[in-house]
Amino acid sequence: MGSSKKITVSYWYKLILHLGWCKGPIDALLEIRGGDRAAWRGRQTANGIININKPNLYGGESAEGGIAGQFEVMLGGADQMPNSYLAAEFGDAQPGYRGRSTIVLRGPKIGAGNPYPKPLYFKLRRIFKGWDDGVCWGKNSNGVPSKQPRHWRYK
């Protein structure tokens, strides 16, 4: 009648990626989204690893999976060292990517049961760090630009 053979219902995507955001350094990473859903929210203000464990973010294995794994944040400081995970995977000749804010996906499982993984979106803050001359325009205004008319630009 039936076979005792197991049927594969879906596949997970396991990604190793190094994504660049912008010129660094940045102040913080605030959010990681997969598609239209938040996978992580917080305030990552130093280089380090974020662990996300939301395998049911899109409905689990029976639907479109989720996100589960490690994301290594590199904010782009002048003293940023080469990434140890990239060196282990692709060889020791890795730059430090100083002056570049990036994230390394350390093989997380993303999505399942869908041939198109959800796009990743990142919410960053770059207000006080990364100025060309090292001087911020408004440290006293807590990152909120002045609304005085002299600061408005007209065309």
Task: Give each language-model segment a name.
Residues 1-155:
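Polar, S/T/G-rich
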